[in-house]
Curated annotation (Swiss-Prot):
This is UvrABC system protein C. GO terms for molecular function: DNA binding; excinuclease ABC activity. It is found in: Cytoplasm. Residues 201-236 form the UVR domain. It comes from Geotalea daltonii (strain DSM 22248 / JCM 15807 / FRC-32) (Geobacter daltonii). Gene3D superfamilies: 5' to 3' exonuclease, C-terminal subdomain, GIY-YIG endonuclease, UvrC, RNAse H endonuclease domain. NCBIfam families: PRK00558.1-5, uvrC. Keywords: Cytoplasm, DNA damage, DNA excision, DNA repair, Excision nuclease, SOS response. The lineage of its organism: Bacteria, Pseudomonadati, Thermodesulfobacteriota, Desulfuromonadia, Geobacterales. Interacts with UvrB in an incision complex.
Length: 622
């Protein structure tokens, strides 16, 4: 184990730190604004609260660091190193999930960047992908400091009496209030796009030309703004090693394991490795055909298509594939198979990523099976609980009561089988009666036995469990097992200085004493995760209903908006939320809504914003 004395030479600057074990295996890669402070926090009693940290530090024998000029550079370098080394304690596989991109429509008067899930071929420019929304937001946060583009829709900003707080922070140029010309704003937007594409030399060239032109025209204030922007870009431009010359490219590697084909996709943007994605599927044909099929399947989705796709092996007749990709992208796309140099090294890195992902999938599957087997034994179940459902209730003193059902298959969320229930037959605060109604609707007569779960979990103790077992008994459902997961309780004795909590307990039918699983064990963490997901899903639905009711009450209180006009508004916009977001012009287009009524409606919905430059123009649904 490493000692705290060995980190005294760490600088107080931004950078990336790499933790290794005695065999020089990379265990963890992290970034920090202040390297010395961050590393020292691992040794402090009040340090990092993640439970893995105590196990991590017991194995760490060496910590190395790489100093960067900016936090943004550290963020990008951290992601690059994680993709390269796949450290055990950074492990957070996001396979087959939606990634995020940044979108900017340059055809609008004042383009803005937004985070989106799908890349559509609508003429806008897309940047990414990013493995999480938080990664995309981190990039935006740094970008706004260099290129102060607007953050919100123009209509939203114009409702305010003066520019928003971001303008005061110099992170928005306030085009909504005429603080910048369209020409200058478009220069910022183009600079931001080139910056995201890694074309920093082009940005500096364009901005130097604009600075010179402004100075020649004796527009010295404008020239000074470009001068400051150029200096900021020069300071912020990443010193990260460029791994390949050229523009954007995707590098593909694969690993075959029996009938399972594992594919790794590395994203290079502006010559820099920015991310990766892994896929796995059954494939009985040869590898060449498998890669060709993957290209077809992947790039025909709504994804970004780069100018070059680098393959580990040649595919039969690549020209038609190139032509199709060119048509989809609207520009030239080349498919290459490198034989030497940096691109061959990148292909080898992609192959290594595919091998690692395959091993991790296999290990995760074996671990998941072991967890389910432990649950079967500890809860005395008759079969392995491959399909688990969990239910929860959310209400405020019986008002707007809702129920939720979440489903997990082999320990993973099966969101296609999530369900929400609006409780209709219970008018008072009676959770047991609400659960009885929800279970009766879920297991109503005629439900196919194939649709039954192996195990049902209820959020609660013996009372909630009894409701479930009575409903199952009344419906003569005998092949579904049940359990109640009761949260831990606070145990505080008089005079005690610390608060202690009891263990979480699992109640079973026809058993007086609950089963107590070892705290922080994998089986208990799985049950708790399922229980918490059911609670989240129920609360989210309840908040949505509360928001709708609030807006409906607002509509009813507006003079001139009767039942007929409310129905017409809902028919036109489709939801109460969209009514609240509508512009004055959009309200005027509704049949039966005159200009006077539309103005009254719009003012009523946005009256809280007057005098508050940072107030949200929308009803808070969350």
């Amino acid at each position: 184990m490493i000692e705290i004395d060995s980190i005294g030479h760490f600088p107080s600057s931004p950078g990336v730190y790499i933790m290794k074990d005695a065999e020089a295996t990379v265990l963890y890669v992290g970034k920090a604004r202040d390297l010395r402070k961050r590393i020292r926090s691992y040794f402090a009693a009040s340090g990092d609260s993640r439970y893995q940290i105590r196990f991590l530090m017991a194995r760490v024998t060496d910590i190395q660091f790489i100093v960067t000029d900016t936090e943004k550079e550290a963020l990008i370098l951290e992601n690059t190193l994680i993709k390269k080394y796949r450290p055990k304690y950074n492990f957070n596989l996001r396979d087959d999930k939606t990634y995020f991109s940044l979108r900017m429509d340059m055809s609008s008067d004042f383009p803005r960047l937004s985070i989106i899930r799908k890349v559509t071929r609508d003429g806008a420019r897309y940047f990414g992908p990013y493995s999480s929304a938080s990664d995309a937001r981190a990039v935006l946060k740094h970008l706004y400091k260099l290129f102060p583009l607007r953050h919100y829709p123009m209509e939203t900003c114009r409702r305010r009496n003066r520019p928003c707080l971001f303008y005061q922070l110099k992170q928005c140029s306030a085009p909504c209030h005429g603080k910048i010309s369209r020409e200058d704003y478009m220069a910022l937007a183009e600079g931001a796009a080139l910056f995201l594409e890694g074309k920093n030399r082009e940005i500096l060239k364009i901005f130097r030309e604009r600075m010179s032109a402004a100075a020649a025209a004796e527009k010295y204030e404008k020239a000074a703004r470009f001068r400051d922007l150029i200096r900021s870009i020069e300071v912020t431009v990443e010193k990260q090693k460029v791994v390949a010359q050229g523009g954007d490219s995707d590098v593909i590697g694969f690993y075959r394991e029996g009938e399972q084909l594992h594919i790794a996709l590395l994203f290079l943007r502006g010559g820099t490795l920015t991310g990766s994605r892994n896929y796995s599927f059954s494939w009985e044909m040869d590898d060449h055909e498998g890669i060709a099929s993957f290209l077809n399947e992947y790039y025909n989705q709504e994804v970004f298509i780069p100018s070059e796709i680098v393959l580990p092996i040649a595919i039969a007749d690549p020209l038609p594939q190139e032509e199709l990709l060119c048509e989809l992208r609207g520009r030239r796309v080349s498919i290459t198979v490198p034989q030497r140099g940096n691109k061959l090294e990148l292909v080898r890195l992609a192959i290594k990523n595919a091998e690692t992902a395959a091993a991790e999938r296999k290990k995760a599957a074996e671990s998941g099976e072991a967890i389910l087997q432990t649950l079967k034994e500890r809860l005395h179940l008759h079969k392995l609980p491959r399909r688990i459902e969990c239910y929860d209730i959310s209400n405020i003193q019986g008002q707007m009561a809702v129920g939720s059902k979440v489903a997990f298959v082999d320990g993973k969320a099966d969101k296609a089988h999530y369900r929400r229930y609006r409780i209709k037959g219970v008018s008072q605060s009676d959770d047991f009666a609400m659960m009885r109604e929800m279970f009766s609707r879920r297991f109503k007569p005629g439900t196919a036995p194939d649709d039954y779960p192996d195990l049902i979990i209820v959020d609660g103790g013996i009372g909630q469990l009894n409701v479930l077992t009575h409903v199952l008994g009344d419906l003569q459902i005998t092949d579904v097992e049940a359990a109640g997961l009761a949260k831990s309780r606070v145990d505080r004795e008089m005079g005690a200085t610390e608060i202690s909590r009891s263990d979480e307990r699992v109640f079973l039918p026809n058993r007086k004493n609950p089963v107590v699983l070892r705290q922080n064990s994998a089986p208990l963490l799985l049950l708790a995760r399922i229980r918490d997901e059911a609670h989240r899903f129920a609360v989210a639905y309840h908040k949505k209903l509360r928001g709708n009711k609030l807006l409906a009450s607002q509509l009813e209180a507006i003079p001139g908006i009767g039942i007929k006009r409310r129905k017409e508004l809902l028919r036109h916009f489709g939801s109460l939320k969209k009514i609240s977001e509508a512009t004055l012009e959009e309200l005027r287009q509704v049949q039966g809504i005159s200009a006077t009524v539309a103005e009254s409606l719009w003012k009523h919905l946005h009256e809280n914003e007057k005098g508050d430059t940072n107030a949200s123009p929308f009803v808070n649904f969350e």
